[in-house]
Amino acid sequence: MDMENLTWLHGKPTASGILKANPEDFVVVEDLGFEPDGEGEHLLVRIRKNGCNTQFVADYLARFAKLHPRLVSYAGLKDRHAVTEQWFCLHLPGKEAPDLATFELEGCEVLEAVRHKRKLRIGSLKGNAFTLVLRHITDRQDVEQRLQQIAAQGVPNYFGSQRFGRGGNNLVQARLWANNEIRVKERSKRSFYLSASRSAMFNLISSYRLAQQLSTTVLEGDALQLSGRGSWFVAQADELAALQQRVTAGELNITAPLPGDSELGTHGEALAFEQACLAEQTELLSLIKRERVEGSRRAVLLKPQNMISNWWDDVTLELSFWLPAGSFATSVVREIMNQDRADDTDIIE
């Protein structure tokens, strides 16, 4: 998907700069949202890694602990071209924990290990704390103004280009699969292609809402989400004024669909709007229904938490913030500056 075609909330930036001049410029620390139990048949291992992707480390841990690879899990993928602190889970029923003091893998450091009663599954993560360094910024004044706007109004909650694969290949393959031009047997590829399809449709609807000044305007039949929650409800016509006040106050978020094999979830005016946005996506919608993917919804806008900016000099900015799981730091950066080098294809947040 071409991110250049998506609408900006604060207008296209005038400043340009570089993200990820080196891995240390992109630091991610997982926030599980809970404290490990301290007992149980699972061992949670927190590792700081640089230059290693998540699955590679998981497979290495399995070999080190003499476990089947399926017995090592994690909450989410992280970029190999960054410094990341991530939790891995080893299933050790009735077994002693391996001696992690002898664990050696270039670019990796074991920070702690603690027992836990439950398996760490994909998505069982509250969020991620990011510390980024943006370099060679051309317009400090514009960036500072945008940081104020982002703190007050947020950014579009777009899925980043990395969700669609290098050069958007996951979406290309999804369309070929949808048209029965290729067969996709590998489970991981099926998952990537379906995820890219749903993410692209979410981005499309969100972009249309922004373009029509509807990102914070409640339509009759909109699906609204309590801030910080996953559940949502439908806006009734006789409640629009009160609901609009709550959206304006930041208590509620307007959502867009990640389409599945069921209805979109909206009604009336909002449903008609979403259907119009997806009118040319029939092949992807058919694929999603054929594969019986469960639908969900996601907030159109995202407000970074605990955002702190620190200028090292007039052209170098250190920026830290927290995002809920599934949201992309690159979508925040997109509202701040244009990237001179679009080196984000491997960032998985």
From Swiss-Prot:
<dbReference type="GO" id="GO:0009982">
    <property type="term" value="F:pseudouridine synthase activity"/>
</dbReference>
<dbReference type="InterPro" id="IPR042214">
    <property type="entry name" value="TruD_catalytic"/>
</dbReference>
<dbReference type="GO" id="GO:0031119">
    <property type="term" value="P:tRNA pseudouridine synthesis"/>
</dbReference>
<feature type="binding site">
    <location>
        <position position="128"/>
    </location>
    <ligand>
        <name>substrate</name>
    </ligand>
</feature>
<dbReference type="GO" id="GO:0001522">
    <property type="term" value="P:pseudouridine synthesis"/>
</dbReference>
<protein>
    <recommendedName>
        <fullName>tRNA pseudouridine synthase D</fullName>
        <ecNumber>5.4.99.27</ecNumber>
    </recommendedName>
</protein>
<dbReference type="InterPro" id="IPR020119">
    <property type="entry name" value="PsdUridine_synth_TruD_CS"/>
</dbReference>
<dbReference type="InterPro" id="IPR020103">
    <property type="entry name" value="PsdUridine_synth_cat_dom_sf"/>
</dbReference>
<dbReference type="GO" id="GO:0003723">
    <property type="term" value="F:RNA binding"/>
</dbReference>
<feature type="binding site">
    <location>
        <position position="328"/>
    </location>
    <ligand>
        <name>substrate</name>
    </ligand>
</feature>
<dbReference type="InterPro" id="IPR001656">
    <property type="entry name" value="PsdUridine_synth_TruD"/>
</dbReference>
<keyword id="KW-0819">tRNA processing</keyword>
<feature type="binding site">
    <location>
        <position position="26"/>
    </location>
    <ligand>
        <name>substrate</name>
    </ligand>
</feature>
<feature type="domain" description="TRUD">
    <location>
        <begin position="154"/>
        <end position="302"/>
    </location>
</feature>
<dbReference type="GO" id="GO:0005829">
    <property type="term" value="C:cytosol"/>
</dbReference>
<comment type="similarity">
    <text>Belongs to the pseudouridine synthase TruD family.</text>
</comment>
<dbReference type="InterPro" id="IPR011760">
    <property type="entry name" value="PsdUridine_synth_TruD_insert"/>
</dbReference>
<dbReference type="Pfam" id="PF01142">
    <property type="entry name" value="TruD"/>
</dbReference>
<dbReference type="InterPro" id="IPR050170">
    <property type="entry name" value="TruD_pseudoU_synthase"/>
</dbReference>
<feature type="active site" description="Nucleophile">
    <location>
        <position position="79"/>
    </location>
</feature>
<dbReference type="InterPro" id="IPR043165">
    <property type="entry name" value="TruD_insert_sf"/>
</dbReference>
<keyword id="KW-0413">Isomerase</keyword>
<dbReference type="GO" id="GO:0160150">
    <property type="term" value="F:tRNA pseudouridine(13) synthase activity"/>
</dbReference>
<comment type="function">
    <text>Responsible for synthesis of pseudouridine from uracil-13 in transfer RNAs.</text>
</comment>
